Amino acid sequence: MDKVWWNHITKAHKFFEDIVETAVKGSSMLLSLPASVPWKETLIEMIGERLQLENPKNAFQEISCPKEEPGEYLLTNYCKKEIRLKYRYGMSYAQFLGACQETVLNDRYIWISDVSKEKCEEWLEFIEEYNKNVVNKTPAIFILEINEEGMERKAKKGIKTIAFNQNIGNYDKYAFCALAASETNCKEYLRPYLAELVSILCSEDVELCAECVEKGIEFLKNPYQTIKSIIETDVRSNGEEYQFDKTEKEMESLIWEVQLKTVFPLIEKYRKRMILSYRGIITRELPIRNGYGQSINEPEEVEIGVLYYLIGKSSLKISEKEYTELENYRNARNRLAHMKILELSTIEQILKK
């Protein structure tokens, strides 16, 4: 699913392309990624491979944010001993490395992972000064990966900011779930419902979305227990535990919203179809009062409950099959109207029509 996300979801792929394009154009960047960014290692691997194709001269490297001051770390790790000996106190590391022609730093793309708030300021100041001192050579390109919200606003002149959460929205997560659902053993008419439900319940973590979609029917039967089981037994691609803080009650409310959005229009469609089929008989029974005491004068205003009432008083005669269907739709409508969720069997009966 990792390649599906980064290659086939439009905005996720554009996010990937923006990183590559920025690096190829020679600009360092401040890259804001949430802790739950999906398949980070795959993203880094894909960027490294793509940069190698775009600019074979430069090497791509990922490092964990070092404890040392940026310039000191780079001088120690990217300059030979004889070059390091040329460095003299009185000039900054950024000045020296920016002007230095004999360092492998000149042909590097360096991804610096998990940069803290304190270290971010150090690296931004270093890169800004480093860039000012680069003359007659290609500079090193730094990709500073930050995980704290709001830090992306700290970027300095000449350093581009690219933020995951500003590029990826809920629709992208739904699109991923829909694409993933097409590969499950779920019945085709259940797949859009599965995608909608997963994308709403697990919107904070695309990797958890992938796990839930893969469960298919098991997830649809009991979303809460399925997510609980995944959290207890599986981990994210980075080895970290899944984080999910919705309560069962909160999940029920979200499930109801999805069912209202998915099922209610089909109940309304069924009501209109019944009215069209028995319009003449219904018209002869009008005007009639509904359960709220309101007068109904037009067939189009007749609700499912009134249709059920007309059958009960034998004004409207339908087959046993039609009666069972009407009863199912009526019960489903009443449950949703009272903010109660439907069983999967009821959902199936309505969606497969």
Question: What would you call each of these model-derived segments?
Answer:
Residues Q52-L85:
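AAA+/P-loop NTPase substrate/partner-engagement loops
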Residues V4-W6, T10-K11, E17-S27, P34-V37, ...:
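Amphipathic alpha-helical interface elements
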